[in-house]
């Protein structure tokens, strides 16, 4: 599933081609996504794009009359095409722009979303989200306060959008390794110093992944069709049985709630 770096990479890739241009019309070939594509999107016509923003894993296209909310789901990606090209099997939505470009949404598993809202504030998919991990609001003091009484393992707690948004399975595993914290540790057992370190490394890991265009494991592509290159720098995720790059101990993989967790027994306590 695309996580925060992949969504931010997509945002940065499409923004220069959309802002200042006008959506001439939308082409919806298959509106049966996670939720049905909003009727307003089918009717889009002559709508200038004012901004392209991100909140958590949602892309937000600001138009004069409202907002398009896009979620990439499990396998979605956005590409900028130089012109209208024949669609392939999983190309479900196009935005045809006044500058000749086309924003094309591809989603083999159709678990993404294209929604419309007049106002972002209070929209049900955005209403209960925690702070952005790259913002000043997310820091060690905040994390420690939220962990103090939490009797659950730290890894699933990091992946809870009410605590902090956008830290999915890949980056939770990588950040806990970088901080030397075992993923099964109770959140309440973390000291303030450990929370300060963890908050710092989460930011560093996410920023490094954004620099590398995100992580491509299967479906994700950048807006220019290239993969994300952070996969080459993964320390633990997807490396079961391979030697730890720090100590040489084989990487362990376990499963919790049907999500894979990767860690080093020696480096993470």
Curated annotation (Swiss-Prot):
Highest taxon of the lineage: Bacteria
GO MF assignments: 8-oxo-7,8-dihydroguanine DNA N-glycosylase activity; class I DNA-(apurinic or apyrimidinic site) endonuclease activity; damaged DNA binding; zinc ion binding
ZnF locations on chain (FPG-type): 235-269
Matching InterPro entries: DNA_glyclase/AP_lyase_DNA-bd, DNA_glyclase_Znf_dom_DNA_BS, Formamido-pyr_DNA_Glyclase, FPG_cat, MutM-like_N-ter, Ribosomal_uS13-like_H2TH, Znf_DNA_glyclase/AP_lyase, Znf_FPG/IleRS
Protein EC: 3.2.2.23, 4.2.99.18
Recorded catalytic activity of this chain's protein: Hydrolysis of DNA containing ring-opened 7-methylguanine residues, releasing 2,6-diamino-4-hydroxy-5-(N-methyl)formamidopyrimidine; 2'-deoxyribonucleotide-(2'-deoxyribose 5'-phosphate)-2'-deoxyribonucleotide-DNA = a 3'-end 2'-deoxyribonucleotide-(2,3-dehydro-2,3-deoxyribose 5'-phosphate)-DNA + a 5'-end 5'-phospho-2'-deoxyribonucleoside-DNA + H(+)
Positions contributing to DNA binding: 90, 109, 150
PROSITE patterns (alphabetical): FPG_CAT, ZF_FPG_1, ZF_FPG_2
Keyword line: DNA damage, DNA repair, DNA-binding, Glycosidase, Hydrolase, Lyase, Metal-binding, Multifunctional enzyme, Zinc, Zinc-finger
One Pfam match: zf-FPG_IleRS
Any one of the GO BP annotations: base-excision repair
Active site per database record: 2 (schiff-base intermediate with dna), 3 (proton donor), 57 (proton donor), 259 (proton donor)
Cofactor note (record): Binds 1 zinc ion per subunit.
SMART domains found in the cross-reference section: Fapy_DNA_glyco, H2TH
Cofactors named for this entry: Zn(2+)
Similarity comment: family membership: Belongs to the FPG family.
UniProt cross-references to NCBIfam families, sorted A to Z: fpg, PRK01103.1
Subunit structure: Monomer.
Known role: Involved in base excision repair of DNA damaged by oxidation or by mutagenic agents. Acts as a DNA glycosylase that recognizes and removes damaged bases. Has a preference for oxidized purines, such as 7,8-dihydro-8-oxoguanine (8-oxoG). Has AP (apurinic/apyrimidinic) lyase activity and introduces nicks in the DNA strand. Cleaves the DNA backbone by beta-delta elimination to generate a single-strand break at the site of the removed base with both 3'- and 5'-phosphates.
Protein name per Swiss-Prot or TrEMBL: Formamidopyrimidine-DNA glycosylase
């Amino acid at each position: 599933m695309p996580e925060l770096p992949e969504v931010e990479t997509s945002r940065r890739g499409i923004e220069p081609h959309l802002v200042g241009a006008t959506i001439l019309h939308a082409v919806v070939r298959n509106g049966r996504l996670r939720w049905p594509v909003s009727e307003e999107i089918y009717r889009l016509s002559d709508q200038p794009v004012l901004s392209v923003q991100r909140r958590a894993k949602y892309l937000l296209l600001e138009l004069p009359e409202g907002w398009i909310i896009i979620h990439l789901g499990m396998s979605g990606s956005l590409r900028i095409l130089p012109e209208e090209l024949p669609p392939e099997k999983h190309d479900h939505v196009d935005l045809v722009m006044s500058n000749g470009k086309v924003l094309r949404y591809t989603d083999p598993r159709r678990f993404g979303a294209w929604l419309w809202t007049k106002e972002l504030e209070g929209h049900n998919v955005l209403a209960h989200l925690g702070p952005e991990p790259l913002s000043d609001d997310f820091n060690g003091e905040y994390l420690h306060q939220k962990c103090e009484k939490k009797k659950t393992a730290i890894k699933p707690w990091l992946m809870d959008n009410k605590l902090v948004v956008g830290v999915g399975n890949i980056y939770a595993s990588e950040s806990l390794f970088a901080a030397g914290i075992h993923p099964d540790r109770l959140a309440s057992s973390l000291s303030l110093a450990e929370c300060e370190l963890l908050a710092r490394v989460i930011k560093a890991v996410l920023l490094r992944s954004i620099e590398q265009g995100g992580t491509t494991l299967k479906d994700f592509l950048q807006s220019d069709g290239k993969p994300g290159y952070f996969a080459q720098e993964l320390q633990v995720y997807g490396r079961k049985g391979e030697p730890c790059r720090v100590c040489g101990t084989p990487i362990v993989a376990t499963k919790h709630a049907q999500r894979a967790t990767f860690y080093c027994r020696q480096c993470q306590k």
